[in-house]
Each structure stands twice: as C-alpha cells, then as structure tokens.
Amino acid sequence: MLLAFAKYLSDNGITPKRRVYVHITVYEEVGHGGSASVPAGVTEGLAIDMGCVGSGLMGSEHKVSICAKDSTGPYSYSMTTKLINAAKESGANYAVDVYPFYGSDVEATLRGGYDLRHGLIGAGVFASHGYERSHKDGVEATLKLLAKYLEV
C-alpha cells in the first residue's frame, strides 16, 4: 500500500507538505521492526499495518482502522485525534479500536529509545496470519486518510 501511495505521488508530481520517510520492515512479527534507523529530527511515527476485524471490534474489511491502544498501551492521544479528524475530513470510512493482543512496529520504535508521537492505522483485514482477506474499500479508505493526514 505504501509503495502504491508513493507511486501515486510520483506519477502526479505531488510533494507532501511535510517531510516523509518510509521505513519498510519484515521484523514486526518478532517485535523489533521499527526499533532502529529512525532519522534525526523525526517527531511522529505512523505504522501502517492491518486493521483487526472480529468479534468485539468496530473495524471491518470496508474501513480503515485507527488503533487507539494495543497490548503495550495507548497510542499518542494528539496523533490519534489528528488521525480521526483526518478520516472525518477526507470522508474515509473508519473505525477506532483497541487491540489487546497486538503490537506494532511503531511501538518498537518507542522501545528502541526514540521520543516521538506515534499512531497506527490499517485497512481492515479478516483472519490475519492465515488466509487473510481484505476489501478494496478498506484500502481506499486507508489511502484517503493517509493523503489527508500527510497534507497531499
């Protein structure tokens, strides 16, 4: 999804109003994906992962999920509020959820000693770590939110 977003920006000659670094990792599953290589001066970290879907959750495959809290604690209140406002302003179909059995790369960034505001979003995905199912509506909602948040 991030590569498609970067291609969209490049193909259309769009430059975000803020500096954006893309950090793609394959270590999220072992808990240290975002713990290193954060450039100096970075003040926010936004993980774009999957949005959980299931019993007791508000998310669906047709929405972008904004995680307010996971197994390690709450995400930055100010950043989560900005993400919710960006979702509303962009018209993205969204849900705010708590994931009690989940951890993200941006949480690893904090454990790595970086001091930044942090947030987590993702397109709704049903049945993770198996036969994962998502819907283009959830992907589109995620991209709408991301574009609004990054001010493109």
Q: Which residues make up each language-model segment?
A:
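Acidic/histidine-rich catalytic neighborhood of metal-dependent amide-processing enzymes
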Residues: 1-70, 106
